[in-house]
């Protein structure tokens, strides 16, 4: 940001939340020409009030008015449906667990939004993500945010060189608590607004109930590791590896009295296998992943680095090698709990995000 000309026009994605509000303020303080854009990516509101488009737009407009910034409101819901949500449903139908936020960043926020912002005369876009961008000799790197507890590089690992070259992350060098304080000091209506959690189009609704409105139920058996029948499930799409909540099986059922967790899904038999406690079947050390994406030059394999198989996980030491089938093989130094097909595995070299891939199966 420091090297940009002050005549640079930046359009910031203003969501109606505290992060994008403060990001907008910081850009103005840097002296740039700033406009804002509110994205409507989903048509239906969460009735509980946690994912209200109307409320978010209202808050975004109040921030824009307070900062004297022009606000564009654009409906990208058709793009989101076609490029993100349909894929989300297809993956769940296969019994996998996709991450729509990763795809949303790649397809919507840093493609559709970027293209629209450029058509409005912007030189770059900005968002309230907690991540950093570094550039050296014309090559861009995605770095983790200064606030490790809020780092969002995991969700941004599919960005390419062009997208990074056109993007700014004003909050990358700031801690979340300081962002809140800045919002309070400036009297932002969003200062104490609850952070969005989970998938935005689901909000605080029950996940299985939401999914059931789009996917038909297919009853099958829930069995233990010995193949003993326990009860019926209503469809593999409604469960994920490592899941405990929603199984509705008391710990008293079984030998150990410990909680039950989803250990595996057998698509061919429409069977869900569950185990108790920290069972060995929940842990694996090797996985195969498809569609590897490297943010800069693809590394020479094999490669020693670290990886995350889910957001908020501490990076885990691993080695990446090439499989014969164009997939990559990842061997962790330690066993990993609940490796989940469909989820993203994201690779790091210290504070640099190298890229990632889609988990296909555990070995």
Swiss-Prot record:
Q: Where is this site: Interaction with tRNA?
A: 129, 343
- What highest taxon heads this organism's lineage? Bacteria
Q: Cross-referenced NCBIfam families, in alphabetical order?
A: PRK00143.1, trmU
**Organism name:** Ruthia magnifica subsp. Calyptogena magnifica
Main localization, broad class: cytoplasm
- What biological function has been recorded for the protein in this entry? Catalyzes the 2-thiolation of uridine at the wobble position (U34) of tRNA, leading to the formation of s(2)U34.
Broad class of enzyme this protein falls into = transferase
Cystine pairs: 104-200
The record's annotation in InterPro entries points to: MnmA-like, MnmA-like_C, MnmA-like_central, MnmA-like_central_sf, Rossmann-like_a/b/a_fold
One GO cellular component term, please give it.
cytoplasm
User: What's this protein's family per the entry?
Assistant: Belongs to the MnmA/TRMU family.
For the region Interaction with tRNA, what residue ranges are annotated? 150-152, 310-311
Q: What is this protein called?
A: tRNA-specific 2-thiouridylase MnmA
Localization, UniProt: Cytoplasm
Instruction: Provide the E.C. number(s) assigned to this enzyme.
Output: 2.8.1.13
> Which residues bind ATP per the record?
13-20, 39, 128
Q: What reaction(s) does this enzyme catalyze?
A: S-sulfanyl-L-cysteinyl-[protein] + uridine(34) in tRNA + AH2 + ATP = 2-thiouridine(34) in tRNA + L-cysteinyl-[protein] + A + AMP + diphosphate + H(+)
Q: Where is the active site?
A: 104 (nucleophile), 200 (cysteine persulfide intermediate)
Q: Which one Pfam family would you cite for this protein?
A: tRNA_Me_trans_C
Is Disulfide bond one of the keywords UniProt gives this record? Answer: yes
Q: Where is this region: Interaction with target base in tRNA?
A: 99-101
Q: List the GO biological process terms.
A: tRNA wobble position uridine thiolation
């Amino acid at each position: 940001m420091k090297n940009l000309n002050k005549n640079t026009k930046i359009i910031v994605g203003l969501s109606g939340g505290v992060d994008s509000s403060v990001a907008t303020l910081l850009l103005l303080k840097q002296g740039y020409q700033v406009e804002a854009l509110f994205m409507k990516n989903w048509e239906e509101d969460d009735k509980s009030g946690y994912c209200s488009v109307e409320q978010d737009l209202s808050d975004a407009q109040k921030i824009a008015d307070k900062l004297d910034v022009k606000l564009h409101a654009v409906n990208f819901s058709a793009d989101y449906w076609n490029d993100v949500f349909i894929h989300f449903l297809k993956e769940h139908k296969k019994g996998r667990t996709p991450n729509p936020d990763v795809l949303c960043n790649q397809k919507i926020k840093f493609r559709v939004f970027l293209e629209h912002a450029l058509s409005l005369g912007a030189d770059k876009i900005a968002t309230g993500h907690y991540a950093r961008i570094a550039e050296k000799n014309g090559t861009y790197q995605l770095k983790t945010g200064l606030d490790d507890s809020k780092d969002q590089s995991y969700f941004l690992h599919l960005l390419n060189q062009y997208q990074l070259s056109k993007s700014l992350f004003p909050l990358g060098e700031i801690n979340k608590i300081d962002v809140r304080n800045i919002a309070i000091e400036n009297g932002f209506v969003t200062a104490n607004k609850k952070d969005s959690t989970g998938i935005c189009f689901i909000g605080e609704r029950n996940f299985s109930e939401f999914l059931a409105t789009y996917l038909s139920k297919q009853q099958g058996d829930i069995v233990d590791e010995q193949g003993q029948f326990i009860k019926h499930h209503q469809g593999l799409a409604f469960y994920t590896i490592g899941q405990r909540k929603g199984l509705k099986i008391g710990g008293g059922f079984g030998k150990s009295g410990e909680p039950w967790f989803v250990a595996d899904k057998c698509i061919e038999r429409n069977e869900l296998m569950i185990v108790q406690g920290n069972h060995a079947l929940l842990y694996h050390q090797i996985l195969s992943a498809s569609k590897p994406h490297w943010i800069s030059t693809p590394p020479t394999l094999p490669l020693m680095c670290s990886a995350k198989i889910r957001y908020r996980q501490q990076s885990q030491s691993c080695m990446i090698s090439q499989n014969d089938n164009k997939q990559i093989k990842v061997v962790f130094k330690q066993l990993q709990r609940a490796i989940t097909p469909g989820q993203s595995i994201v690779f790091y070299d210290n504070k640099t995000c190298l890229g990632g891939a889609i988990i296909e199966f555990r070995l």
